[in-house]
Amino acid sequence: ALAVDAQSFRCIREMTPVRHFYVDNVLGNLPATLAAANAPGGAVYPPGSVIQLVPTEAMVKREAGFSPATGDWEFFELEVDGQQTAIRARGFAEVNNRFGGNCFACHAPARQPWDFVCEDSHGCEAIPVSRQMTGALQRSDPRCGEPELQSGDRWALFKLQALVWIGTTKAAIGRIF
């Protein structure tokens, strides 16, 4: 069985970039993961594939039959701090990210032929986070040491922080009323 724990996740910039996200394979089969990621018409990812758009969220392809409903993908909500990674939540169709969004519900439209991997043309709804923001998060992953910020990254991170504050405030108000 494929063992996935907090040590399975590392500095996002040490993974392999593919367009605007990063991939790895915890079983060492990176060439097959890259072949799937780069297949123009879509492909099924091999077991052990790890996909991350931002340091705090990941999806890992499990063994065939592990979770047929999710295409055998397990979703992870991560906490990253310095060199440490902790798993905040993990699972299949039931996992929500820290903003209350259901991971699988977002990825479900990309079922075929994209193996549940969202990109602009894969049928998934757009997320309220710009490419500049995800890039800034990737370049500032605290597990990687010094941030490699580019022009505009500080502003993008500020705007993202404001979105997070608004989202958590709305959620808190919703719980009260």
Model-derived segments and their meaning:
Residues 42-177:
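Sequence context surrounding c-type heme c attachment/ligation sites in exported
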Residues 1-47:
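N-terminal secretory signal peptides
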